[in-house]
Amino acid sequence: MKHSYFISDLHLSETQPELTALFVDFMQNLAPQAERLYILGDLFDFWIGDDEQSTLIQQVKDLIKSVSNQGVQCYFQHGNRDFLIGERFSKETGAQLLPDYQLITLYDKKILLCHGDTLCIDDVAYQQFRRRVHQKWLQRLFLCLPLKVRLKIAEKIRAKSNQDKQAKSQEIMDINQAFTTEKVQEFGVNLLIHGHTHREAIHQQEGFTRIVLGDWRKNYASILKMDESGEFGFIKD
C-alpha cells in the first residue's frame, strides 16, 4: 500500500553515533519504500551554514539524495536548531525546502505542517530570540563569519538554550492550545503534524487531530507513517 513518512527532531551530531545509525537504517530500509518523506526540522543538532563540511553532514546528504533518486519526494522544514539550512543543501539532497507553515494534501487529507516552535508562544524569551535570529540581514552577517567563529557562537547559544530549559516549566515550553487552534482554523484543516516539543502523541482535539512527532533517542526512532487509506500511526518495533 502506498504510504509516506514524517520525522523530526533527530538532532544528529557526531557525539551521538547511535542516532546516526538509526537514521542510516531508516533511510536505507524504510524510506525508499515511501512516496513522500517529510523532515519537519531539527534533523541536525545545529547548523552553521551550507558551507560546513564533515563526514556526518556528507553522509546525511548522501542518504537523502539516494532516497530522492529512488523516486521518493523529500521535503525539509526548518527547525529551531537547523534554520540556516539553505538552497545549497536542497540542491545537493533533492529535498524541497518548506516554509514555517506548509499546507499539503496527502491521500485526500488536507494537513498543516510546521516544526512546532512557532506554536510555543508562551515561551516569550524564546520567541524574541527567534525573531532576532530569523532576520535576514543578521543571517547574512553570520554566514560571512569564518566557520570556526560560527561554530563557537553556535556552541554558546546551544549551551545557553540547554541552561534556560532547566529554569522553564514544561507548560511554557509546550504549544499554546488557543493559538494552535487559531492556526488550524486559519488554514482550514482538521489535521496538524508538528515536532519540537519531543512529546510523541496523537491528540484528538475539538475539531481537529494534532500529531506530535517525537525526538529520536538511543534505540528509538519516532516515525509517523500515513498510508493511502488515510490511516496513520507511529511505527513500533
Swiss-Prot record:
GO terms for biological process: lipid A biosynthetic process. Its EC number is 3.6.1.54. It is found in: Cell inner membrane. Disulfide bonds: none annotated. InterPro entries: Calcineurin-like_PHP_ApaH, LpxH-like, Metallo-depent_PP-like, UDP-diacylglucosamine_Hdrlase. It comes from the Bacteria. Pathway: Glycolipid biosynthesis; lipid IV(A) biosynthesis; lipid IV(A) from (3R)-3-hydroxytetradecanoyl-[acyl-carrier-protein] and UDP-N-acetyl-alpha-D-glucosamine: step 4/6. One of its GO terms (molecular function) is manganese ion binding. Keywords: Cell inner membrane, Cell membrane, Hydrolase, Lipid A biosynthesis, Lipid biosynthesis, Lipid metabolism, Manganese, Membrane, Metal-binding. Mn(2+) 1 binds at residues 9, 11, 42, 198. Pfam families: Metallophos. Binds 2 Mn(2+) ions per subunit in a binuclear metal center. It catalyses: UDP-2-N,3-O-bis[(3R)-3-hydroxytetradecanoyl]-alpha-D-glucosamine + H2O = 2-N,3-O-bis[(3R)-3-hydroxytetradecanoyl]-alpha-D-glucosaminyl 1-phosphate + UMP + 2 H(+). Mn(2+) 2 binds at residues 42, 80, 115, 196. Its cofactor is Mn(2+). NCBIfam families: lipid_A_lpxH (TIGR01854), PRK05340.1 (NF003743). PANTHER family: UDP-2,3-DIACYLGLUCOSAMINE HYDROLASE, UDP-2,3-DIACYLGLUCOSAMINE HYDROLASE-RELATED. This is UDP-2,3-diacylglucosamine hydrolase. It comes from Haemophilus influenzae (strain PittGG).
